[in-house]
Amino acid sequence: MYPCTLLMVLLCLAIMTHGHIQIHGTGMRRNRRDSPHPPSPIYDSFYVPKKGWDETKPGTVLASRNIQAGFTKTQKINLDGAYQLLYRTSGVDDKSPSYSVTTVLVPKNARPNKLVLIMAYEDSNFVECAPSYKIQLGAPLETNPIQTVEELMWTSVLNDGWTVTIPDHQGPLSAFSSSFIHGHASLDAIRATLNFEQLKLDPKSAVVGMGYSGGAIAGGWAASLLGSYATELNVVGWSIGGTPSNVTGTFYGLDGSLFSGFSVAGVAGIVDSYPEVNDYVGSVITPAGNAALQFTREHCMGDIVVGLQNVNLTGKDFVKNEKNFLTDKRIAPILDHLTMGTDSKLTPKVPVYMYHALHDEVIPFDRANQTANAWCKGGANLLFQEYTGIEMGHVSTEVLNTPFVLKFIRDRMSGREFLNGCQWKSDLNPLWRPDILGARLTEVFNSILNFFGTSVGRTDRIIQESIINHNFTSK
């Protein structure tokens, strides 16, 4: 069986079993004002800042509101409050004003001087796929099984008493893979959360950031930009896994594959955030290629993977004359600029925990390893955990390594020493020991395992059966 991973795209197993899945679109046809769901960001005035917003400082709270978070109801999490903040941030550079929304969840047992930045994977260019929308009670994606698994992991963080902030780190255009937008929006979400007076958080609160896969784009770039963009923040650690650190390498790695929709979405995100890229790509792309880009702007991840399989970015169906536009002099320098580790001045200044499966079939291991080496040469303090077992793929690494991510958060919050310099560790697979985290979290991990079955791996039939019995495309 072809290896299939990534929590959000396990639906590919069902595709192989049934031959096809009909796409249930998450696109514009859902954006009706009379919808029973919470209003789409397209129609929700909360997402639009008032005049003069661009004259404020990054991290300024422009608007706030209370919300109900759907998964906290199903997981029976006792929250003290759930808020959304519209805040000022920056775009592709710090001279380009932008804005975004972050969702703040405060558990009853919250500690006043601790904050966890959770960077969710979105991997789409459609605003209705942003965390701030799909988290809301009654949102179309709120009960999607794929969404549920990631939220089970967030539950672990909340159960530990950490206030969390979950930004729409792709910005108002949902510009997937536009690295600096991801990083700026993540750092400014921290600022906005600390600035939100109702929370009464200590401005010097210890902060740990965590992100996997598409969320690791945000995490890696937030770590890179912290030392130059948000020096006042007391970030004490970054956890990033399955990291797409090299945009170009990821595009090539996924090109023409079952997961090529991610490449198309990445191209769309860069096209939408860099006018010069938009102009050039617009001149060489075919109508079918343009339709593929537009598809990613109107659908969420599940539909993108199903609808855009085996797309070749340099093929005749996507680009005129089968031109490799990624190497063009008008685009290649920008893609290089968006690669983690190419600028030594952007080396992370606080501890970094990276983890990656050697046989990751979605995000290339070698590229993440290269970034780790570059950061270490720049003086980073970094632990790189490699999993070499053949059973370890993209999804199994995220799920099974969760206890060690949470242990990293705990250690950083408690002020434990981190290694001085860099270390590479290699194991077949994570040591599955929920007891590391305390008995009260066992139920959370059992919920994750029960969803997938007792084993999680590249040939797991139990996962396949779970997918077949659920609708893994968005509604």
Swiss-Prot record:
Signal peptide: 1-19
Active-site feature positions: S213 (nucleophile), D360, H394
Bridged cysteine pairs (disulfide): C129-C300
Keywords attached to this entry: Disulfide bond, Glycoprotein, Hydrolase, Lipid degradation, Lipid metabolism, Signal, Virulence
Reaction it catalyzes: a triacylglycerol + H2O = a diacylglycerol + a fatty acid + H(+); a monoacylglycerol + H2O = glycerol + a fatty acid + H(+); a diacylglycerol + H2O = a monoacylglycerol + a fatty acid + H(+)
Positions annotated as glycosylated: N246, N312, N369, N471
Domain of life: Eukaryota
Transmembrane annotation, as ranges: none
GO molecular function, one term: triacylglycerol lipase activity
Pfam families found in the cross-reference section: LIP
Stated role: Secreted lipase involved in Dandruff and seborrheic dermatitis (D/SD) probably via lipase-mediated breakdown of sebaceous lipids and release of irritating free fatty acids. Has triacylglycerol lipase activity and is able to hydrolyze triolein. Mostly converts monoolein to di- and triolein, while free fatty acids are only produced in low amounts.
Name of the protein in its database record: Secreted triacylglycerol lipase LIP5
